[in-house]
């Protein structure tokens, strides 16, 4: 098996980041959107409801960008090849979510966040730092991230207009899979993060949501 150095992995990381930071859809879509085949209901949504759905989906799109960057950063600094593989797998599985959200954003006639490059780079650095604390902490970081995303998606499902069935189908599928990712990390040996770290993570997520809602 070929050994990849830190610098090899860094080059791969930059190559994977470019489509995201240039706000282009990733090409590695492996599954159709859960909303595919559903009848659009945009015509029955008011202007305010369309704006609400678009803003919520933009937040979720940014959330997927951050998750992908976090896991890529952690994989870059992880010492165990097995953990690197798990983290890269988690990052890859977020690509579908990323594209589902972006497709829906365009259908709602709005835009992705103009700060995608900032969100990605910031999360990548956090992931790099988290990976230096060891493999079990990396898995704990993955599990906590997924649990927070799952709770966040539950709140958005409550806020979505009732008639926006396409966005709802996407978020419900994402919620199920984020929970599965968290449980997989826990079963692999993740250690719970200190409450203060959980609080900091939640505060950063709240800041991201507030900004991405508008830009």
What are these language model-derived features?
Residues 1-215:
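Non-heme di-metal
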């Amino acid at each position: 098996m070929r050994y990849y150095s830190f610098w090899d992995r860094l080059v791969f990381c930059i190559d994977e980041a470019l489509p995201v930071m240039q706000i282009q859809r990733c090409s590695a879509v492996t599954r159709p959107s859960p909303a595919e085949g559903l009848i659009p209901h945009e015509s029955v949504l008011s202007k305010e409801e369309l704006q609400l759905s678009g803003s919520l989906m933009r937040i979720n799109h940014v959330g997927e960008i951050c998750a992908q960057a976090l896991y890529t950063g952690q994989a870059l600094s992880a010492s165990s090849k097995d953990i690197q593989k798990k983290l890269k797998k988690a990052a890859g599985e977020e690509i579908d979510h990323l594209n589902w959200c972006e497709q829906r954003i365009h259908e709602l006639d709005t835009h992705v966040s103009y700060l995608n490059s900032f969100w990605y780079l910031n999360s990548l650095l956090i992931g790099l730092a988290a990976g230096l604390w060891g493999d079990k902490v990396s898995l704990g970081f993955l599990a906590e991230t997924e649990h927070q995303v799952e709770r966040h998606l539950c709140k958005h499902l409550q806020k979505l207009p009732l008639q926006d069935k396409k966005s709802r189908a996407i978020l419900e599928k994402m919620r199920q899979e984020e929970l599965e990712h968290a449980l997989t990390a826990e079963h692999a040996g993740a250690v719970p993060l200190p409450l203060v770290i959980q609080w900091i993570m939640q505060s950063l997520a709240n800041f991201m949501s507030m900004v991405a809602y508008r830009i």
